[in-house]
């Protein structure tokens, strides 16, 4: 994210920001003709402290909940692979996923978002290394710039055997 814009005087002293959703490494090479790099969803910013270190937290603003249409909720156990395509059917390419993964004995837990075109994004959490990774090397047209198709990762402190994620998937970014 680049060039965040924040607002002052938001209700309840909130700090709300949007940002340009692109990367200077490939911003001029995206495979579009008129539409280039949207803004992010509005998100609330806050600070938190762990072991004396202060961190910035970013979460989608609660007003986004008003945009939800239909909600589906499921609990299930996975040993190996499970396909949940029916849960996101009919979403026209935009949906939100909130999930809590409770790990029983795996060193790595992961999932894949994919579509009927063969495009896919893999996400994994390495429980031992405490690293979350996202692999977008097969996410569609990735050949427009050598810096786009990549595996990225970040350190994440999660609960002992639990990982909570909130994913906003759209069809235009």
Task: Describe these PLM feature segments.
Residues 5-173:
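Beta-rich accessory regions
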């Amino acid at each position: 994210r680049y060039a965040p814009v924040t607002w002052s005087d938001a209700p309840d002293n909130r700090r709300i920001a949007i940002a340009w959703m692109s990367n200077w490494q490939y911003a001029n090479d995206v495979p579009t003709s008129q539409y280039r790099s949207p803004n992010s969803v509005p998100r609330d910013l806050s600070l938190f402290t762990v072991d004396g270190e202060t961190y910035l937290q970013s979460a989608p603003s609660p007003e986004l909940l008003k945009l939800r249409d239909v909600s589906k909720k499921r609990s299930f156990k996975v040993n190996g692979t499970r396909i949940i395509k029916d849960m996101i059917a009919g979403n026209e390419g935009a949906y939100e996923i909130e999930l809590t993964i409770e790990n029983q004995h795996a060193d790595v837990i992961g999932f894949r978002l994919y579509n009927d075109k063969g495009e896919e994004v893999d996400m994994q959490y390495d429980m031992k290394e405490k690293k979350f990774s996202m692999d977008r090397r097969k996410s569609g047209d990735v050949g427009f710039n050598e810096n786009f198709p990549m595996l990225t990762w970040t350190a994440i402190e999660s609960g002992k055997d639990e990982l909570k994620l909130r994913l906003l998937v759209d069809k235009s970014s």
